[in-house]
Amino acid sequence: MAISLFCYSSRAAEDVKGILNLLTVQHPGLFAEKFLISRVDDLKNPTTYSDSVSVEIALEHDMRASCLFLVDLNDKSAASLLPTVEAIIKSALGDSNVLILFNNEERR
């Protein structure tokens, strides 16, 4: 079974891209091997993203999301590190600026 963290952020997509790039440099063993970070989808740009469902999912959790990215578990033996990954992302983006949903369903 695939495990993904759906990460919605109220920060601008370009800001999030920069922060995620920094995280991959700071934690190469974590984000280059055990977990994979997807590209950042700009939910505010209708030419690059037209799925309003993602915006609605975030709104259901009181988040006005500007962007979305996924963190996929690449190494099944690293599943116990999910709370660590969540904490790193929340710390980097600001806890109030990010909504993390386990498989796009369960709030973390």
Q: What are the functions of these language-model segments?
A:
Residues E33-Y49:
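Ser/Thr-rich, low-complexity intrinsically disordered terminal regions
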Residues K44-R108:
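Charged interaction segments
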Residues K17-L20, F35, L81, V85:
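Generic alpha-helix signal with a bias toward terminal, lower-confidence helices
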